[in-house]
């Protein structure tokens, strides 16, 4: 797959996650919504935010490498998303939603691996795993 395909696939994944949350929470969601974070406040664009500002979601459509290794740079980007979410008020439900991708060598998904190795950084950010083939979401941890 060419690198030019990745942004399109990421956008499709983001839309599917948005639809899942709308169907399962009965709320309206906005894609790429800016919210103020930090002090002094500066706008940051979050992938998906509930219209009533109660839920914020960052989507990560990452897979294992071709040789079934951890995509370590992408895990760093996921930590960055958690960092931004952590600046939102505690009134928000905060999620990182990852694509379900199974490593048969390790017998674990990338979201399971991420949670296992980074749960000490998560605070009140929840990790979820979305399977677009089955339209199923699973809370990790």
Kindly give the residue locations of the regions a language model identified:
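Acidic-and-aromatic substrate-binding clefts and catalytic sites of carbohydrate-active enzymes
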Residues: 37-41, 103-105
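Domain-level recognition of nuclease-like catalytic cores that cleave nucleotide substrates
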Residues: 95-141
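Catalytic cores of nucleic-acid endonucleases
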Residues: 59-115
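Active-site beta-strand-loop-beta-strand hairpin of nuclease catalytic cores
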Residues: 46-61
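Flexible, charged surface loops at secondary-structure boundaries
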Residues: 41, 49-51, 88-91
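Catalytic phosphate/metal-binding cores of nucleic-acid and nucleotide-processing enzymes, i.e., regions
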Residues: 18-25, 29, 41-43, 69-70, ...
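Short, well-structured alpha-helical interface segments that form or flank functional binding sites
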Residues: 12, 43, 76-80
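Acidic-basic catalytic patches of nuclease active cores, encompassing PD-(D/E)XK
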Residues: 1-36
């Amino acid at each position: 797959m060419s690198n030019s395909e990745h942004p399109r696939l990421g956008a499709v994944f983001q839309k599917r996650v948005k639809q899942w949350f709308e169907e399962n929470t009965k709320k309206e969601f906005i894609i790429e919504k800016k919210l103020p974070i930090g002090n002094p406040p500066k706008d940051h664009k979050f992938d998906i935010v509930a219209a009533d500002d109660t839920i914020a979601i960052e989507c990560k459509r990452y897979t294992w490498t071709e040789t079934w290794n951890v995509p370590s740079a992408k895990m760093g980007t996921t930590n960055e998303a958690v960092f931004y979410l952590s600046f939102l008020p505690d009134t928000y439900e905060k999620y990182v939603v990852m694509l379900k991708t199974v490593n048969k060598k390790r017998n674990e998904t990338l979201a399971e691996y991420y949670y296992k190795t980074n749960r000490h950084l998560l605070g009140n950010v929840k990790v979820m795993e979305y399977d677009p083939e089955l339209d199923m979401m699973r809370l990790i941890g």
